[in-house]
């Protein structure tokens, strides 16, 4: 049997998740849905648009986490709102997004696409959080192989880096691709990518990092235990 590529797994899990959540009546007409960012979230946005187009879903209100997702929603005809809009009222019924790493306890790392702040705002204000990923995303411990993104104020980079190093992290300023200089987030900030020499407690470290002056947000997501769907190379989708 041919093994699915990473891209094929992402498409599979995105479509499976949307269709399964509709069947389970966890996604239905009239919902306020947060939509994530990145190569796994985009197929989910597309599948949601297809289920709107075929009449399965109506009156879906989307809140997005990046310019990328806003552009996709515009292309697919999904109305986009802000959490501040009266129609949304600061709370979402459900949010769906990919992840960079998923631990057995369902804590995750997000922010590989530099949208972690907006992703956390949206997903921490959703009643239900859904995470989708390919087989490479399931790991035993977070942040020892894939770096943890930490969004920082540019003028605080050196003191923030020193503070994180005292906690056991090794920091690298994320550089732009096809752009000279560092990555600039949609919020005008910079990203430190942090690798941990030893496994850390994500919940405790999420709090510690955000206590450092100059840190805007970090990519540990531990507040909600999400519904998790992970695709496998042999074409199955499993729930964690």
List where the protein language model places each region.
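Conserved phosphate- and dinucleotide-binding cores of soluble alpha/beta proteins
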Residues: 2-12, 23, 68-240
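Short helix-loop-beta connector
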Residues: 21-31
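Short active-site oxyanion
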Residues: 30-33, 55-62, 107
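Glycine-rich beta-strand-to-loop/alpha-helix junction loops that act as flexible
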Residues: 32-40
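N-terminal active-site wall of soluble small-molecule enzyme domains
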Residues: 40-50
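Active-site histidine-anchored catalytic micro-motif
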Residues: 50-53, 57-60, 66-77
């Amino acid at each position: 049997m041919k093994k699915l590529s990473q891209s094929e797994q992402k498409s599979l899990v995105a479509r499976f998740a949307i269709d399964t959540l509709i069947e389970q009546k966890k996604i239905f007409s009239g919902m306020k849905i947060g939509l994530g960012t990145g190569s796994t979230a985009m197929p989910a946005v597309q599948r949601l648009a297809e289920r709107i187009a075929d009449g399965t879903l109506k009156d879906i209100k989307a809140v997005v986490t990046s310019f990328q997702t806003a552009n996709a929603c515009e292309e697919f005809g999904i109305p986009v709102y802000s959490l501040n809009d009266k129609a949304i009222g600061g709370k979402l019924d459900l949010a769906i997004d990919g992840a960079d790493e998923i631990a057995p306890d369902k804590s995750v790392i997000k922010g590989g696409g530099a949208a972690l702040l907006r992703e956390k705002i949206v997903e921490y204000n959703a009643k239900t959080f859904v995470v989708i990923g390919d087989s490479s995303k399931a790991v035993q411990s977070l942040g020892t192989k894939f770096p943890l993104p930490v969004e920082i104020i540019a003028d605080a980079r050196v003191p923030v880096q020193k503070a994180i190093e005292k906690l056991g992290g090794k920091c690298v300023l994320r550089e732009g691709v096809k752009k000279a200089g560092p990555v600039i987030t949609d919020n005008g900030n910079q990203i430190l990518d942090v690798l941990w020499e030893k496994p850390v407690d994500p919940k405790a470290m999420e709090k510690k990092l955000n206590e450092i002056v100059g840190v805007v947000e970090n990519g540990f997501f531990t507040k909600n235990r999400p519904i998790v769907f992970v695709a496998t190379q042999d074409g199955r989708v499993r729930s964690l």
